[in-house]
Each structure stands twice: as C-alpha cells, then as structure tokens.
Amino acid sequence: MPSRRDIFWLAGTAGLAAINLGDAVAAVKNPVRVRTITAGVELSPALELERVEAALTFLTRAKQTLTAAGYEVQTVRVASNPVIASLAPAARSKALEQLRKIDQLIAAHGAVFSTGPIATEDRTDDSLIEWSQELVRATKSISISTVIASPERGVLPKVAALSAKIMVALAQTLPEGLANFRFAAAANIPAGTPFFPVAWHQGPDGFAIGVETPAVVERAFASLRPSDDPTEKLRGALNEVLLPIEKLATGIAQREGRQYVGIDTSPAPLKDRSIAAAIEALTHRPFGTGGTLEACSIITAALKSTAVKSCGYSGLMLPVLEDPLLAQRAGEHRYGIRDVLLYSSVCGTGLDVIPLPGDTSAESIEGLLRDVAALATRLRKPLSARLFLVPGKQAGELARFNDPYLTDSVVMKLD
C-alpha cells in the first residue's frame, strides 16, 4: 500500500490553476523575512510616553542589527500589558488623550502599538463598544483585542458577546470596514505573542520576533522526494533559516538587557508569499480539497518542533484577505468559514481576516466566536478571530480594498 508521502508525490498537479510553483519558488531569492520585532513594555494607568519611547529606541537598534545581517524587517511594534482592561469607564475615556499621544509617537517611528486586551473579565461592559470606535477614529497605529477564552477560566461568553458587538460597530467606523483590521477576539493567547492585533505583554521588558516563511515551506515541499518525510524535511528547512535569526536575537538581548521571548514560527503570508501555494506544493491539489487538513497538520508539526525558542501562536496562519491564493480558492468555493475552523483544530491561528457580509448580525458573530473559544479551550491552544464585515456587500460578492496589505476577495457566507 502506498505511503502518505507516495500519495502526495504521485498526485500530480491537476487542478492547480493560476500558479506555477517552479516559477514562484525560483522568484524568491531570500526565503525569509522578519515580519515583526515586537517589544513588550509594562505601563501603568498613566500610559507613560517615556516607556514607549524607550521601547522604540530599542527597536531601532534591533532592526539595524537584523538589517545589517541581511534581513528585511517589515515592521516594528510595541505591545503593553492589559492596562486599559483595568480602568473604569471614566478613566478609560480620559486615557484616550494619552493614547493619541502614544499614537503620534509610534507613527513618527514608523511603528504600531497594541494596548493588549481591553476586556479580560467575563462581564458585560457595552461602554467599550463606543470607546473602541473612538479609539480607531482618533488613532492610526493602535490595535486592541479582547479575551474570549483563557487557560484559567475557559470560555468567556459575555466577552464573546461584547466582542461581536464591537466588530459590528467597527465595521461602520472607517471606510471599507477597515477598523476591524485593528481588532481581534483572542482565545488562550499567551503574553509575548508578537503578532497583532492580539499581542500583549507581561513581566520584564522583552521582545519577540515574528517571521514570514511561506517561501521556505514552499521550497521544502517543492523539492520533496518520495522517500522524504515531509515533516522532517520542513523542520530542517525551518531550522536552517530560523537558527541564525535566533543567534542574532540572543545577542541583541544580551546587549540591551531585554528578555528574548522567542520566535513565533508561524509562516505569516503576504501578498507575494502565499501559504496556500506552499500547501498546494505538498498536496498537488487546490487548497480546500482533500488532503488540505492533513497538510495543515504536517506543517504545524514541523512548526511546533523547531530547534528555536518559540512563542505566540507558532502555528499555521490562513489569513484570507492577506493571501491572494487563499482568496482565490474561497472564490472558487473550495472551502468555507467552517472549514477554516476545522483546519484550526490541527494548525494555527483561528479565523484571520475573514470577509463577511456587512449586515452580519452580532448574534451570528457571537456564535462563531464562542465556537473559536470552545475549540481553543478544548484543545488548549491559542486561537483568535479577526473578522471583516464588509459594508454593503453580501455573500458571494467581490469585496475590493484600497489597502496595500489586503487582497480583493469574494465575501464568505457565515451561516
């Protein structure tokens, strides 16, 4: 009987419309980018500007070190402890002015900032809905999140309901629903996660690194032979590119006196580096068809077993609006939202930048968020939901975005 590797090898390339794996792989000269260096800082309710500025100064030096070593560093970011969640509504409103100042400081350095979760206890606080809208109107570089599940308390249903209401409100706050790019509902997300909008900090000043490695994954699978174990092949390829980054990071930590939290090994895709293409390099079938779930599991097994110190999700990301091939396969109706949730059971980050109809109800979103929270709780893994309600669009219609980081996509059906 043929092995799993033989089946993948013999499957051929039928159905792989719109991509040429050989050309795509050859076109990528440097297979790894540093998506983010994220510095973590502990702030008091005063939201001290000098603490943020010190983190930005550190990030400038850290970026210079990585750039000098030949790495493209796409973003630098600062994440704080969940100080906003500790404030009463009146104090939270007063904090908006200081957050505006932080936003100006952050923007001047070409960085972005996360306040950490704004809701961490399972209670109803609808004042956070309007506050979230005011924040995204008043700032350009600040992200927020909520906690819909935690390892200690499990699912937080009241926060899930609140999060759904925030998503509906944010969809009407900025053009094209883009405010939801800066908000996510987080389940079991640990401190030190470098990726936004769920990043948050706890403890001594530290930093973490997020990487963009879909090209590494694709190269590893494109060169796979029948005798190769795909997990071992990918693990070796990842170690080859991640260990040099970790060596630089530990050196930075020693010089700067900051804790090195680790590398989030998640292969964050972008428009020109597709995780869907990497998966199809393994399955030789369009993403969403048979074999996709197993491929997700294989990739995740490699991501979870690298030789570097890992942090955050360290799992497979499937962001529909950031990966043109994922968006294309969704438009071909090869997978749906529930399929992505299924893939999350064996892979990574949950539901990320999923385009939904603009009139989706808060009740429908709440149900989906509770599903994400339940899955994260049952499997004891970090998941999140960043959902894009597209104003004026219905399921099946094409949504276009005037944003360099987002790709056009068919709006997906929720229920």
Model-inferred region functions:
Residues 1-14:
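N-terminal secretory signal peptides and thylakoid transit peptides that target proteins
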Residues 9-12, 19, 113, 355:
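Generic detector of intrinsically disordered, low-complexity, polar/charged segments
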Residues 1-2, 19-30:
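C-terminal segment of N-terminal export signals and the immediately downstream linker at the start
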Residues 25-415:
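Anaerobic metallocofactor- and corrinoid-dependent redox/one-carbon enzyme cores
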